[in-house]
Regions:
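Hydrophobic ligand-binding cavity/cleft-lining segments
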Residues: 1-54
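Beta-strand/loop substructures that line and gate deep hydrophobic ligand-binding cavities in soluble
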Residues: 95-153, 162-164
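Glycine-rich portal/gate segments that line the openings of hydrophobic small-molecule binding cavities
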Residues: 48-102, 110-112, 153-170
Length: 170
């Protein structure tokens, strides 16, 4: 990831892609299984569907429990904002109309395989990262850059794991 100098109010975006030798339907089964994200992530520790639902659909909510060495532990509530099998799965953290973060998987057929993209947007609503920014406003661009780089690294790991699982399942 290259330095951008972006600040939180810019709502910066980061994405990663991978080509998977498996059909979109098989990849969809993995990316839409929210418990798998907790298994793959070093930060997301546990995910639980709320309101008695057991799977993804627009409007369904889930809790995410997170831990980070520099930021401690916290819990978020996310809402599924897009659920279009086997093409797009997205959720907003916090208020879906004004989220603290947005995440999305996009699946595109590529021959007999799938091009999978994971995408993240910071903000526009405040998040736990704002505690560090408020404490060191002169370092905001660096704080944002480091956090975005962490997300990019995590995405690359997630995509590699999803690729491995999807290809082994075939």
């Amino acid at each position: 990831m290259e330095w951008t100098g972006q600040v939180y109010a810019d709502s910066p975006v980061v994405a990663a892609k991978i080509l998977i030798d498996a059909p979109p339907e098989r990849v969809w089964d993995l990316v839409s299984e929210i418990a798998l994200m907790a298994e793959l992530s070093s930060e997301l520790q546990e995910v639980t569907w709320l309101d008695g639902v057991t799977g993804p659909a627009v409007g369904h909510r889930f809790t995410g429990r997170n831990a980070h060495p520099a930021m401690g532990e916290w819990e978020t509530v996310s809402t599924v904002t897009e659920c279009d099998p086997p093409h797009r799965f997205a959720w907003a953290v916090g208020d879906p109309a004004h989220p603290s973060a947005s995440w999305r998987f996009t699946l595109k057929p590529d021959g007999e395989g799938t091009l999978l993209e994971q995408w993240y947007q910071m903000g526009p609503a405040r998040s736990g990262l704002n505690i560090a920014i408020d404490a060191m406003p002169d370092k905001e661009a660096k704080i944002v850059f480091v956090r975005m780089r962490e997300h990019e690294t995590g995405m690359r790991h997630n995509l590699a794991e999803i690729k491995d699982r999807a290809e082994r399942a075939g």
